[in-house]
Regions:
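N-terminal nucleophile
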Residues: 1-257
């Protein structure tokens, strides 16, 4: 499970703003965000068990994230949702990523998942349950966890929205500052929704803040390797700016050819 908030196309200089807390078993290892070789280049963390990822950005400015969710009819030996997320990041647009998700999920070989997909052209959520549903991402703030996007029955989602909208989020700086506080909120008492989860064997294991601007130099990628109420956000923005600049150069070269 995870908690992800995306502010989409409501801040002109930063059309994609993301905050996400990842929940996983504590003994499931992962690697810090790094640039993955291949085309297109990807910046993401890697799950060492399956080799997939939970979220990332590619050099075309495509964001893809995945949140696990319940599914009634689970396959006996499910394919990795994280590997699918990584494969979606190898596509060149949000629409291509949606097509790949639909093609793979329709095989019935995956456990339940929500895929959040966005670039500057379009944004989507794929609800991968027993019935697959594609929902266009609305402009503004959307929140998703283990249910449908912007599910009014999700108490954790409602808490997240309340914390993020205590002030107007009309710039990347304001969104990231507010999100870093909200997503670092310590665990709530038992029985109440919280931003950071902590139990004996699993809980919040990392947190990510992302801003994708119109220009590569404006991109931000911050990552906390641990629950963000205890671990500090470290800056990986130079890596993100590097791959976005590479993507822009390659696009200009193709246009001249």
């Amino acid at each position: 499970m995870c908690l992800l908030a995306i502010q989409y196309r409501s801040v002109p200089e930063a059309p994609i703003l993301v905050a996400a807390n990842r929940e996983e078993a504590y003994d499931r290892g992962s690697l810090l965000p790094s640039i993955q070789a291949g085309k297109p280049r990807i910046l993401c963390g890697i799950d060492t068990k399956a080799g997939g990822t939970w979220l990332g950005v590619n050099q075309q400015g495509l964001f893809v994230g995945v949140c696990n969710r319940h599914k009634m009819l689970s396959p006996l030996v499910p394919k990795s949702r994280g590997v699918l997320c990584r494969e979606m990041l190898r596509t060149n647009s949000s629409r291509q990523a949606v097509d790949l998700a639909m093609e793979e999920l329709s095989t019935g070989k995956y456990d339940g998942a929500n895929f959040i997909i966005a670039d500057q052209e379009s944004g989507w959520v794929v609800h991968g349950t027993d019935e697959i549903e594609v929902v266009e991402l609305p402009d503004g703030l959307s929140i998703i966890s283990s249910g449908d996007v912007n599910d009014l029955r999700d108490e954790r989602g409602k808490l997240c929205r309340r914390l993020l909208t205590l002030q107007t989020l009309d710039s990347a700086v304001k969104f990231l500052a507010r999100a870093s506080q909200a997503f670092s909120r310590p665990p709530a008492p038992e029985g109440r929704p919280g931003m950071v989860n902590r139990s004996k064997e699993r809980g919040t294991v990392s947190s990510t803040l992302i801003a994708l601007g119109k220009k590569p130099r404006d991109a931000i990628f911050q990552y906390a390797s641990g629950a963000p109420d205890q671990a500090k956000y470290e800056d990986y923005s130079p890596l993100l700016r590097d791959i976005l600049s590479r993507g822009l150069r390659e696009a200009r070269t193709r246009a001249k050819a």
